[in-house]
Amino acid sequence: MRYFFLTVSLLLSVQLSAQHSSFMRSGKILFERSVNKYTAVENFVRETSGLPANDIYNYMQAFRAGAAQFWTSYFELRFDSTHTLYQPQDPNLKYPDDFYVPVAYKNKVLNNLTSRESFTVRQAFDKTFYVKDTMRHIRWKLTEEMRDIAGHQCRRANALIADSIYVIAWYADDILTKGGPESFNGLPGMILGVAIPHEHITIFAQQVQEEAMTTLTLPEQSREDVLTHATFLAQIKKMLAQFRLNYSWMKFFIAM
């Protein structure tokens, strides 16, 4: 009997050790960000141009005939136990020529998960903004729904951000870092998928690699022209008003 209990104890120890070693603490994730251009451009024209409905219909028919439906771009998220760094896979990434909103096309987001400090680099037309503030706080509601993303079992969570915008996120609790793409964070594990249905935006992991990380930093952190998030939003609002671009989707996408 003593040998039986010893054997069971050893098996449990091995099992717990295997489970413990399966947790990922640092690595690199490749994300695909997709924007439905057909919907975004149609809403842009409706909100900013004042075209009659028939003209909008004809315009969009021509646009759809000559443009791909989705704008897809690729970003890498590097992470360890205390930091996440999200930036374009291609540092020379450009926005599509057939898309009217040259904003947020090569965002960079560095989050310090210990101090809850965030440093972001964002684009609006030909201007780049450098923003330093606390990380976004999101009130998530966890669900029981599960799905596989890039080989990881992920649990669904829902939230409202910017007062009324519905967000669906999927997180993997076997990746211990509580980060995610863009400024999304705050779930019990790494966020591998984000869907924003009303804004027609998705961000999903394509590959996840475990690897050791050196210190995660951005060279732009040393700049002096750094804004708070509130000041950044105020400047964006003023810029869009000057161009008569009171477009709600654009405001959200710039600050996402």
Task: Label the predicted regions.
Residues 1-24, 256:
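Bacterial Sec-dependent N-terminal signal peptides
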Residues 20-256:
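Extended soluble regions of mature proteins
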